[in-house]
């Protein structure tokens, strides 16, 4: 089940990032010790009253304080409107109503999105500042007063957020593979989608979806059901310039959240970019299957070493997803497109694979005999056993005497051992450690 997306918008310096951090507290997931995974977080997983949602901070999209002009604010709002289910429009009670607030409100009123007007920097509810009442003029309902810096009113705001969130999406059948095509603008996502749907034996369903599902295309091939989450379809509805790459992560995030397997498209003429790394990092952190598609391979000048050199470059720049298979394709000519769904099927099998506890421990015990876990601070580390506790992605728990002493590098060694013996190509592996006797 996918989570709704809530975007915080507003002009600069009204407290968007402060509100973002206040709601998330320590919930932001940052992967440590993995080179290439960005840490400049613009989104986080939030929860209130047992309802989970994604929170997006548009304030983090343009960190350049020298370029605070309304055109940038407008792009932030448009990006949020495009991807979000609910908008938190933040205004500043101390500064009062300003023309930029009215411009943003005009844009929001023209949309069909739910909007909550949030009046920040209200330090006391006993006596509202006179400026508070001016915000009623925006025509977006009664403002909710808060102080993001001290937490005043945050609970009431989140109560309202939960009331306004859309009902959960319709769930597809368990065996339906949800595929997201992700990547930077103009990398060929639309062409790939059209190629896949135009393949022989692909039957596209004509079942209409909900508003949010309108960009989903159900189809079958050889008796297997798929859902193609078409981020290119979102783009066609957008007024956002495709040259504004920093905003494309919102589109990718919405698709990644709902997918099982992500097709990360890279432009062969440019190679992996920082933006590719960021999008890949989102997919990795969300535990999705990943296949790297190097598109426009037909126009790359090649010699006998080109394939090898290009593969090595991708592995170096996207080292944290070294498990992902790489396909060199051309969406324009159809080169190797037939391999895409074949690889999706293989990754799906790996995504759902289970290893018996007995077999898993036989392999790990043999590896630990050859390379025992090093002691830490003079204290020996004992690994008792491991077991697989979940799939999609494959998730393992290792029971030890002192979990905090087991270095991440040894956990990485155990992960590599699992991969060498059991495969899991195309999927991340999640490993946690627990003290024996813990639930």
From Swiss-Prot:
Residues 4-169, 177-352 form the EngA-type G domain. Transmembrane segments: none annotated. SMART domains: AAA. This is GTPase Der. Keywords: GTP-binding, Nucleotide-binding, Repeat, Ribosome biogenesis. It comes from the Bacteria. Disulfide bonds: none annotated. GTP 2 binds at residues 183-190, 230-234, 295-298. Pfam families: KH_dom-like (PF14714), MMR_HSR1 (PF01926). GTPase that plays an essential role in the late steps of ribosome biogenesis. Residues 353-437 form the KH-like domain. Associates with the 50S ribosomal subunit. The gene is der.
């Amino acid at each position: 089940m996918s989570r709704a997306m809530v975007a915080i918008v507003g002009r600069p310096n009204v407290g968007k990032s402060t509100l973002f951090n206040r709601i998330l507290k320590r919930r932001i997931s940052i992967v440590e010790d993995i080179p290439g995974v960005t840490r400049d977080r613009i989104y986080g997983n939030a929860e209130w009253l047992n309802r989970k949602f994604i929170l997006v901070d548009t304030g983090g999209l343009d960190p350049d304080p020298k370029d605070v002009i309304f055109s940038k604010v407008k792009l932030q709002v448009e990006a949020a409107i495009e991807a979000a289910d609910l908008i938190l429009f933040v205004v500043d009670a101390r500064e009062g109503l300003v023309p930029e607030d009215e411009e943003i409100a005009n844009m929001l009123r023209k949309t069909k999105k739910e909007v909550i007007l949030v009046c920040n920097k209200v330090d006391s509810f006993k006596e509202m500042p006179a400026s508070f009442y001016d915000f009623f003029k925006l025509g977006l309902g009664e403002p909710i007063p808060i102080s993001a810096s001290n937490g005043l009113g945050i609970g009431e705001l989140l109560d309202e957020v939960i009331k306004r969130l859309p009902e959960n999406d319709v769930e597809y059948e368990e065996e339906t593979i949800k595929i997201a095509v992700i990547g930077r603008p103009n990398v060929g996502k639309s062409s790939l989608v059209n190629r896949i749907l135009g393949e022989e034996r692909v039957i596209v369903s004509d079942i209409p979806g909900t508003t949010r599902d309108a960009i989903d295309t159900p189809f079958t091939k050889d008796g297997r059901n798929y859902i193609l989450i078409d981020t290119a379809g979102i783009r066609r509805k957008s007024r956002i310039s495709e040259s504004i790459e920093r905003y494309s992560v919102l589109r990718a995030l919405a698709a990644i959240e709902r997918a099982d397997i992500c097709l990360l498209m890279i432009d062969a003429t440019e190679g992996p970019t920082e933006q590719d790394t960021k999008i890949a990092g989102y997919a990795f952190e969300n535990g999705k299957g990943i296949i790297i598609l190097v598109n426009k391979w037909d126009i790359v000048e090649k010699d006998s070493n080109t394939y090898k050199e290009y593969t090595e470059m991708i592995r170096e720049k996207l080292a944290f997803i070294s498990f992902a298979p790489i396909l060199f394709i051309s969406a324009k000519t159809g080169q190797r497109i037939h391999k895409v769904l074949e690889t999706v099927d293989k990754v799906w099998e790996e995504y759902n694979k289970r290893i018996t506890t007995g077999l898993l421990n036989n392999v790990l015990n043999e590896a630990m005999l050859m390379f025992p876990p090093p002691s830490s601070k003079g204290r020996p580390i004992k690994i008792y056993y491991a077991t697989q506790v979940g799939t999609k992605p494959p998730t393992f728990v290792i029971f030890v005497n002192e979990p905090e002493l087991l270095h991440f590098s040894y956990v990485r060694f155990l992960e590599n051992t699992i991969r060498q013996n059991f495969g899991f190509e195309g999927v991340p592996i999640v490993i946690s450690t627990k003290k024996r006797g813990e639930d």
